[in-house]
Amino acid sequence: MKFFALFIYRPVATILLSVAITLCGILGFRMLPVAPLPQVDFPVIMVSASLPGASPETMASSVATPLERSLGRIAGVSEMTSSSSLGSTRIILQFDFDRDINGAARDVQAAINAAQSLLPSGMPSRPTYRKANPSDAPIMILTLTSDTYSQGELYDFASTQLAPTISQIDGVGDVDVGGSSLPAVRVGLNPQALFNQGVSLDDVRTAISNANVRKPQGALEDGTHRWQIQTNDELKTAAEYQPLIIHYNNGGAVRLGDVATVTDSVQDVRNAGMTNAKPAILLMIRKLPEANIIQTVDSIRAKLPELQETIPAAIDLQIAQDRSPTIRASLEEVEQTLIISVALVILVVFLFLRSGRATIIPAVAVPVSLIGTFAAMYLCGFSLNNLSLMALTIATGFVVDDAIVVLENIARHLEAGMKPLQAALQGTREVGFTVLSMSLSLVAVFLPLLLMGGLPGRLLREFAVTLSVAIGISLLVSLTLTPMMCGWMLKASKPREQKRLRGFGRMLVALQQGYGKSLKWVLNHTRLVGVVLLGTIALNIWLYISIPKTFFPEQDTGVLMGGIQADQSISFQAMRGKLQDFMKIIRDDPAVDNVTGFTGGSRVNSGMMFITLKPRGERSETAQQIIDRLRVKLAKEPGANLFLMAVQDIRVGGRQSNASYQYTLLSDDLAALREWEPKIRKKLATLPELADVNSDQQDNGAEMNLVYDRDTMARLGIDVQAANSLLNNAFGQRQISTIYQPMNQYKVVMEVDPRYTQDISALEKMFVINNEGKAIPLSYFAKWQPANAPLSVNHQGLSAASTISFNLPTGKSLSDASAAIDRAMTQLGVPSTVRGSFAGTAQVFQETMNSQVILIIAAIATVYIVLGILYESYVHPLTILSTLPSAGVGALLALELFNAPFSLIALIGIMLLIGIVKKNAIMMVDFALEAQRHGNLTPQEAIFQACLLRFRPIMMTTLAALFGALPLVLSGGDGSELRQPLGITIVGGLVMSQLLTLYTTPVVYLFFDRLRLRFSRKPKQTVTE
């Protein structure tokens, strides 16, 4: 009583306290960062190693395996995957959430150093690592195009000047440059000319290497001066290499230009990048796992004018893709939804109270509670993201509830003739415990979420804390500011109604009277109500089991990512043509704004595409509908497939795949894995629950298998090293020398001119110079035949692995796909030597599925404990919790009605309903207990009176919560796919619970009261006896 009086009778102090809360909130709001979702990225480090010309199997056994054994000893590694392809290996290390990325990077470097002695000696450089997840979509893509400069020169500008500068920007984890390679001098050898001159490929390589040497020459001193010695020991351009003498034949000089075509070109000619049908160099920028995407993008944009000045004017630097506009648009939509929710909630209060003066009170209390929450969010290190802003939107209905309960009770005393200040004190005292119970039990719902681990726990923590803080501030405001304003602003008379609102008042009275009559009938037919209540419990279980489930709603971020997978024996020239064809099909779609892509490198038969869609306001279709439309057109392209997926804000795992979800096959027997993977993939491709089924296992690449006749080689004076060196020199794009320039180093690349390698007959033109100086054709000591070989070798941990990726067809959920895959694996009878498990997002979904029911039960148990402590009763909490089954039925039915799967967002809605719907029961039970203690009423009379007296505040609080959530359901635009499941769940649950709990709660109250009396009499009878 003294606590309430302290604030009611000291209005200045109370107002200043509220102003202080508001000012702190405004300051916090201005300093809060902006993000699409809470920070949930796993710490990921990518290790890269290269050995030019090495086969995928060689890379896997000699490079990947030693590194994996060393890296696998690092503490906190939750997943390690590797992929080895032609000349390169990439190992992805995913760490536990609590592992510091910088500490992990130091351990990775130490592990690389420890494995160095086990790696092949021919590697051109040590393995390197980057603190970025290569499977994440780039946050920004920059393109360089020019009508003047070559692709190699553009790549040089990008990798030498732009990429290092961008990498230094805070938040940037990796800048991947694609579309070409560094400039180089290429030596294309003519094997017939070499044979005619008696010159071996090793002779050419040695001559070039010896002619381009950069060594210190020292200095001369003559007593008074010091002279630095400088020579022309370096060759820089193709023109300088052409006259190089590589051999003498019968006294005549054989120059490099006589036996080869020497050009200024690039290190790897098998690379291509394009943007909107124009050749381009791509800079794909990815952020650090812990970085804020908006701040990082803003920093890059601020740096662009400076970057533009460092490159020639003839080079056009453009932003091809930027993830931030859709994120900002989504957050703006949520902010608008929040404002609409506040307006609707205040309108509900006005309709019920029918007084502008009284409506001002919650109209002040709600903003103070919400704005004050921003200060706590800043102190907790949170951000303004979709989930935290949705928490505030939902909190609108909660925070007004507290003010409504206090305001309505004070208004009731005023209408009875009590003086304002006395009414404020008396009314607040009567409902103070009710408001406390409602708030604490609501916060208790989120305690299990705060203790939840893994990705779901990280994702939901900001939502739970934000909502809990808003409720806590609301509790303070409703017990301080609200009664003070009531005491000083409201008048001791019945408020005048506007004529247009009298009809609503009469309707409310009629509803209350109708409810009273129906409640009398229900209290006389309690068994029927009990059956209905049990039926709702059973229906909850059935609906939860049957409803489709997924991990997270499919987002429309306005960005698509596509992976091209062509025939494994395709040439680079044909693959470049496929890239152009696919890009034209996509570019012609009316919903597409920009398309960028590249192909080449170590995997000739694959490519990547990044597609930016037009803003949501300029297109009528969702990203998934656009993918469905494009899928039909893309299927007509022969010899290659383009798999499209919408980029999501949450992606788990480091695997680069062509679809959103993965199923990984593991085996210690590589032969068994290669035997069963095609069978499993073909079976999964027939399932209607899956789409775009593809695999990263590529073991049907064309290979030319050479078999040496070692006896013949020994007789001819040839060793295996010389033969292998011949093949590497001829076909491996061998880097044989380095050209040093002030800004970078470039390579001299040697191979047989591609004009002479159009078919396998090129091998017949190869020869080796033996130890007697004779030219011995390769066909004399080797035989060859076509064979199949893997284009990539994949590991997970230390086991051979193959990952099958898939998307979901429209109308299918991840739970449908998961169940279908499990059935298919059982039907196929896959042996125990091949193990299958979901990976990435699908794996997190499986783990979340197992914990959802436990989480809901834990929330209910927590609420029960809190209510039991508050009421000092085992029974009354059960009465209050009896409101939950009807809410669950309403929520699940609403999801079914809107064809929305049960996701993590819907789970949040269920948790919120546990806190919302019990408020009705709390108000009924509180007043019933008060009437029994002080009004000398029977339990039935007490609960009946409580239901009628609390009918208006129950309707007000329920409608306030419902209208607070309704904008989430009706909202469109960016990010609506995240908001709608939450709104659907809450609105559906509230409607159903409001219809049922007004009747079930009094019946359950009387049932437990009779049960209490029955058990309380038994001890007395025993004593009497």
Swiss-Prot record:
Q: Which UniProt keywords apply?
A: Cell inner membrane, Cell membrane, Membrane, Transmembrane, Transmembrane helix, Transport
Short name of one Pfam family for this protein?
Answer: ACR_tran
Do the record's keywords include Cell membrane?
yes
Q: Name one GO cellular component term.
A: plasma membrane
Where would you find this protein in the cell?
Cell inner membrane
Q: Which SUPFAM superfamilies match?
A: Multidrug efflux transporter AcrB pore domain, PN1, PN2, PC1 and PC2 subdomains (SSF82693), Multidrug efflux transporter AcrB TolC docking domain, DN and DC subdomains (SSF82714), Multidrug efflux transporter AcrB transmembrane domain (SSF82866)
Molecular-function annotations in GO: xenobiotic transmembrane transporter activity
Q: Does the keyword Cytoplasm apply?
A: no
List where the protein spans the membrane. Answer: 3-23, 333-353, 360-380, 387-407, 431-451, 463-483, 528-548, 853-873, 875-895, 897-917, 953-973, 984-1004
Q: What induces it?
A: The mdtABC operon is transcriptionally activated by BaeR.
Q: Which domain of life is it from?
A: Bacteria
Annotated membrane topology = Multi-pass membrane protein
Family stated for the protein in its record: Belongs to the resistance-nodulation-cell division (RND) (TC 2.A.6) family. MdtC subfamily.
Subunit composition? Part of a tripartite efflux system composed of MdtA, MdtB and MdtC. MdtC forms a heteromultimer with MdtB.
Job of this protein = The MdtABC tripartite complex confers resistance against novobiocin and deoxycholate.
HAMAP family in UniProt: MdtC
Q: What is this protein called?
A: Multidrug resistance protein MdtC
